[in-house]
Amino acid sequence: MTQPNFKRVQKRNPHQLVVDQHVHAAHCIRKFADEKGTVAVFDKSISRWVQRKPDAAIFCAKRAWDQRSEKGYMISIETAFFNVIDNINTPLTERRYDDISRYYHLWRLRGVARDKERQNVHFNKVGGHRLTIDEQEILEKNGYSFILENDGLLHHLASGIEIQVMLAKICHDMGNIKWGLLTARRGEFLVADYYPGDSFGLEPFIPVSPKHAFFANTLDSGIDVHQVRELNRASISSSGNYFFCRTLEKCPF
């Protein structure tokens, strides 16, 4: 699986910048792990199933956004969502819909950022700074963005800002989504690497365990194996580089 070129860090990564960035959080992937701690992944680049741990490289983008984003607003959104899925039986009336929506859109925007062509942003009539690689990494480590004399605003710095702005806009424009919990009576859910939105004419949904998925603007309900199959097919169609599950034999598609 290849990704666009990315700005590499210094040898030995002295400032401990995150290079391998999860598109879908490892905590969420771990909900689908088997007794060995791995998930079954269909890797589209090689057209076959493989077993991978939740921290595997296949689940990560290569420095597609900056450290400020990775360790700042993204962590806050993830933590709130983890609280929701770790307490999956919370009643519908007490469910934190906004926390689900923010994570859903963050996940999607990170997937887009993973696949996007990497280009720096240049500004007319704006002078930049002459900074060594070490100075750049120190600034990024401390949450700063900067414009370089020749390279402008580096792609991953711009991407972190863009994701944050787009996230706020999307959440505002879409308004309040009420997420119902679907429980599979038979069969288990597959998960796409990310979901590109309503491109396939389906309401947003998020598989959160082999047996559970949040589905936009519906009530909590149990679903049969045919409905599970329909959602799994949507996950496969939505996927870009891979899709995964706990046990292939239990996933109708």
List the predicted regions and their residue ranges.
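Alpha-helical structural context detector biased toward long hydrophobic helices
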Residues: 1-20, 24-253
